[in-house]
Amino acid sequence: MWPFASVPAGAKCRLVETLPENMDFRSDHLTTFECFNEIITLAKKYIYIASFCCNPLSTTRGALIFDKLKEASEKGIKIIVLLDERGKRNLGELQSHCPDINFITVNIDKKNNVGLLLGCFWVSDDERCYVGNASFTGGSIHTIKTLGVYSDYPPLATDLRRRFDTFKAFNSAKNSWLNLCSAACCLPVSTAYHIKNPIGGVFFTDSPEHLLGYSRDLDTDVVIDKLRSAKTSIDIEHLAIVPTTRVDGNSYYWPDIYNSIIEAAINRGVKIRLLVGNWDKNDVYSMATARSLDALCVQNDLSVKVFTIQNNTKLLIVDDEYVHITSANFDGTHYQNHGFVSFNSIDKQLVSEAKKIFERDWVSSHSKSLKI
């Protein structure tokens, strides 16, 4: 019925947030707990989850979500959780707690062993989906600030499920030739919507390049193109901006996003606001990068603030016309090696709502000047 149905604006997407209880503001949006709970409650056939790691039992709300998944699996709903091979620390405990859930570890880069599964998304029944920066952990559900998108528009959910099929093909328990055969089968039908064919003003972008498949857009290409074409404003809320790629313990300069930000400020006079995280998960280069941007653009309209509470929100807004929500840092290692899916939209309402979130965070008491 999809070809004959009108496409709703924004593909029925709603913003989803986790806000820690110690923050001085609340959200008007769906919470991550409510989003995951709704996906589980409405599921009839399957729930597929992709996350670097799986540690929902670390908080009370995370444990409640896992218990609901357990109940769903006991009713015959097919549940598959994809984890990165290096994020399976709690796997034994979870399997013993719920043997009906199928946990699959993946290795998206067996050849070089440097790529990780970073993607954070849920898909159910080809009808509902979540994509954002909330991994399947108790912290992301309850105690760490995150941002994502929920949609119950079937065509969008189906398109995201194709990404799940791609990552699932890299099951670390399979032989390499089986992985290649599986990937060859799923990649040719890898997406229906992209930057040149969004649905309701929405499309996904992907990384890394060797997992793109037919018609998919490389995330770094879209992000850099948007930064380089910015005319009036760039708002960035990220855990880290790191202009390096790490391989085998060595660091290599990767200035693509970093340079695009500087060029926008200096060459075109674009107003830029950068809100970075400052907690123990930060790359050591992150604060140095923020300070260098602040120093290089001291004569330009570029401002940098630091968010003092655990913040895993990864948000980009360009010219108040485009929004990008992802699970990856603006980090060369993430963009060159890791597997993830990002949400993109040019829908005016979604961009406006995301902008309000950025403005709220920017002026909050938790945002401090880099110079303090």
Curated annotation (Swiss-Prot):
**What kind of membrane protein is this, topologically?**
Lipid-anchor
The protein's name? Envelope phospholipase OPG057
Q: Which domain of life is it from?
A: Viruses
Q: What does its record list under induction?
A: Expressed in the intermediate phase of the viral replicative cycle.
**GO BP terms, alphabetized:** viral budding via host ESCRT complex
A Gene Ontology term for the protein's cellular component:
viral envelope
This protein's assembly is summarised as: Interacts with protein OPG190.
The Swiss-Prot or TrEMBL record describes its family as follows: Belongs to the orthopoxvirus OPG057 family.
Taxonomic lineage: Viruses, Varidnaviria, Bamfordvirae, Nucleocytoviricota, Pokkesviricetes
Q: What is its EC number?
A: 3.1.1.-, 3.1.4.4
Which reactions fall under this protein's catalytic activity?
a 1,2-diacyl-sn-glycero-3-phosphocholine + H2O = a 1,2-diacyl-sn-glycero-3-phosphate + choline + H(+)
Extract the PANTHER family matched here: GM01519P-RELATED, PHOSPHOLIPASE D - RELATED
What does this protein's UniProt record list under function? Major envelope protein that plays a role in the biogenesis of the viral double membrane and in egress of virus from the host cell. Produces the wrapped form of virus that is required for cell-to-cell spread. Acts as a lipase with broad specificity including phospholipase C, phospholipase A, and triacylglycerol lipase activities.
Localization per Swiss-Prot or TrEMBL: Virion membrane; Host Golgi apparatus, Host trans-Golgi network; Host endoplasmic reticulum membrane
